[in-house]
From Swiss-Prot:
GO MF term list: hormone activity
Full protein name: Gastrin
Modification type Pyrrolidone carboxylic acid: residues: 1
Keyword annotations from UniProtKB, A to Z: Amidation, Hormone, Pyrrolidone carboxylic acid, Secreted, Sulfation
Family matches, as InterPro entries: Gastrin/cholecystokinin_CS
Regions that span the bilayer: none
Description of post-translational modifications: Sulfation enhances proteolytic processing, and blocks peptide degradation. Levels of sulfation differ between proteolytically-cleaved gastrins and between tissues.
Similarity comment: family membership: Belongs to the gastrin/cholecystokinin family.
Annotated GO CC locations: extracellular space
Locations listed in the record: Secreted
Length: 17
């Protein structure tokens, strides 16, 4: 988990989903 919870769409960009 990280600071990407706020922006689900944009955050997943740098995540390994």
């Amino acid at each position: 988990q990280g600071p990407w919870m706020e922006e689900e769409e944009a955050a997943y960009g740098w995540m390994d989903f």
